[in-house]
Curated annotation (Swiss-Prot):
Binding site for Ca(2+) 2: D45, D47, D49, K51, E56
Record function comment: In muscle, parvalbumin is thought to be involved in relaxation after contraction. It binds two calcium ions.
Membrane-spanning parts: none
Source species taxonomy: Eukaryota, Metazoa, Chordata, Craniata, Vertebrata
Species in which this protein is naturally found: Rana temporaria (European common frog)
Location of the protein in the cell: Cytoplasm; Secreted
Record-given protein name: Parvalbumin alpha
EF-hand domain span: 28-38, 39-63
Entry keywords, A to Z: Calcium, Cytoplasm, Metal-binding, Repeat, Secreted
Length: 63
């Protein structure tokens, strides 16, 4: 589970950060999940290859 990598509180903060104002119903919709993944990839892909390698992922979740 994600809680093996991230604290539950950090996961909750991340979900809240991506919620559209006035629309969040404590569920992630397909469109929101797509946005989350695009932002995550952009933030983690430091070498610009369109992928997140292990080192990039570790750096991303450690920040």
């Amino acid at each position: 589970p994600m809680t093996d990598v991230l604290a539950a509180g950090d996961i909750s903060k991340a979900v809240a950060a991506f919620a559209a104002p006035e629309s969040f119903n404590h569920k992630i919709e397909e469109e929101e999940l797509g946005l989350i993944l695009k932002v995550l990839l952009a933030a983690g892909d430091k070498d610009g290859d369109g992928k997140i390698g292990v080192d990039e992922f570790v750096t991303l979740v450690s920040e």
